[in-house]
């Protein structure tokens, strides 16, 4: 089949790489570079990013890693060990040790919660915040986790999503960092697509998607190309806006917003390669120091620390100032330099659909959606994208067989 892919973000490129084995594929990307919110920006020798924090939520064992291997990408992903620690009262604790920081009554409550969550024995209709709120520290820790991983507060996160995430965590484990950062993944996807004779067109903005009974068309200012199938890597809302198909039939997906601050430090802030969750910060939910995995992500003699925070109010300046105050407290007298502050919202958010508000990937036999507006259930960030891509690729390959 001839397949057109609109958008060269992680979702679009992963779909293209998988389909390029058996189909003719063409990617249309509006920017001069591919990778969307998952690629590097070189700034003074530091590998900053267009979005992601150089982390893959289930590391070398999750959905994304599996699909990368399946399409022939050689990406080395180093699993974090420990997955994450939690800074409470200035000290870093493993998850299991947090239970000892509260009184006996709260400890029993928290242990019961953890056991119920592991067994899926919880009310699916409530939020994660409601589930945790009877133990103050548990709610703070929950907020740090959802803020870091989903750019949502615990109260904004549906319990149903948390149950699925817990299942994935027990199946695949915690995060990992790809060597070369986000761009390490994107470069390999591009290599595979080109090896399979796929075509990637940059600076090629798509203005229209026309779906007819027997064909589909991708239209720009100076082109109108015919395809058997179109895969859109744009948000469901934008895809609907430029196409002749009604996509959002029920509730609109709700985007999640966030702020990332990149910090240079000679001394380093943490010794491990996992996440440092910061439940006691005013705004920062967590941070990582990716140079503990790959020193090439910063100039010689430096570490790169990336912090993330949910955007809680619409006053972005105030949100950033509170984040900077947190950083000052976290560094506690150590030398550091703020490299870059990025806020993510509107057309360039953390997620086009916050977890629990994603739409389905399959619109009809000719039009499919991939990306973070259509993640699989319980799929954190790029793992959720990979789950959606898997579904689309299976559907298209089945369609090809039956036609
Ligand atoms: C601050 C922050 C931190 C994050 N941290 C992580 C993390 O550590 N780990 C993780 O797994 N995820 C993380 N994420 C989320 C992850 O970066 C995104 O979910 C993912 O990159 C989105 O990929 P996508 O393919 O859905 O969309 P995009 O990357 O947005 O790709 C869509 C592409 O379509 C192109 N496009 C748009 N309109 C048109 C048009 N009309 N014509 C042609 N092309 C068009 C865009 O230019 C873009 O390249 C983070 C996100 C942010 C913002």
Positions of predicted regions on the chain:
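N-terminal Rossmann-like FAD-binding beta1-loop-alpha1 element of flavoenzymes
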Residues: 2-27
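C-terminal structured subdomain/cap of oxidoreductase catalytic cores
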Residues: 17, 26, 205, 209, ...
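Glycine-rich FAD pyrophosphate-binding loop
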Residues: 20-44
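A conserved beta-strand/loop capping segment in the N-terminal third of enzymes
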Residues: 40-49, 57-110
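Rossmann-like flavin
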Residues: 84-164
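Helical element adjacent to the flavin cofactor pocket in flavoenzyme catalytic cores
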Residues: 165-215
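Mid-domain catalytic core of redox enzymes
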Residues: 208-303, 310-314
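Conserved flavin/dinucleotide-binding core of flavoenzymes
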Residues: 290, 296-403
């Amino acid at each position: 089949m001839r397949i057109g892919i609109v958008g060269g973000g992680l979702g679009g490129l992963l779909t293209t790489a998988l389909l390029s084995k058996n189909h003719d594929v063409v990617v249309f990307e509006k920017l001069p570079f591919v990778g969307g919110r998952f690629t590097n920006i070189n700034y003074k020798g530091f590998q900053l990013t267009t979005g992601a924090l150089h982390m893959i939520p289930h590391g070398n064992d999750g959905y994304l890693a599996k699909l990368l291997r399946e399409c022939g990408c050689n990406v080395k992903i180093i699993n974090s060990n420990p997955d994450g620690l939690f800074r409470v009262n200035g000290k870093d604790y493993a998850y299991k040790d947090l239970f000892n920081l509260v009184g006996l009554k709260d400890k029993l409550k928290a242990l019961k919660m953890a056991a119920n969550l592991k067994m899926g024995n919880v009310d699916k209709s409530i939020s994660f915040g409601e589930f945790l709120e009877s133990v103050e520290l548990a709610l703070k820790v929950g907020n740090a986790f959802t803020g870091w991983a989903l750019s949502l507060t615990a109260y904004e996160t549906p319990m149903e999503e948390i149950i699925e995430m817990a299942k994935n965590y027990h199946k695949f484990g915690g995060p990992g960092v790809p060597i070369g950062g986000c761009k390490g993944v994107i470069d390999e996807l591009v290599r595979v697509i080109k090896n399979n004779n796929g075509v990637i067109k940059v600076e090629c903005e798509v203005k229209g998607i026309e779906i007819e009974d027997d064909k589909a068309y991708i239209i720009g200012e100076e082109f109108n190309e015919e395809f058997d199938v179109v895969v859109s890597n744009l948000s469901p809302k934008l895809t609907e806006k430029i196409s002749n198909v009604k996509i959002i039939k029920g509730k609109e997906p709700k985007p999640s917003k966030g702020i990332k601050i990149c910090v240079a430090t000679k001394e380093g802030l943490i010794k491990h390669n996992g996440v440092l969750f910061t439940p006691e910060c005013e705004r920062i939910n967590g941070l990582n120091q990716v140079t503990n995995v790959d020193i090439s992500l910063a100039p010689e003699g430096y570490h790169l620390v990336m912090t993330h925070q949910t955007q809680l109010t619409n006053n972005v300046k105030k949100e950033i100032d509170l984040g900077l105050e947190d950083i000052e407290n976290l560094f506690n007298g150590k030398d550091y330099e703020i490299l870059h502050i990025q806020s993510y919202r509107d057309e360039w958010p953390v997620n086009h659909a916050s977890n629990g508000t994603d739409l389905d990937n399959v619109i009809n036999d000719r039009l499919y959606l991939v990306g973070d507006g259509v993640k699989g259930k319980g799929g954190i960030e790029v793992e959720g994208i990979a789950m959606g891509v898997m579904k689309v690729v299976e559907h298209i390959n089945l369609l090809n067989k039956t036609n």
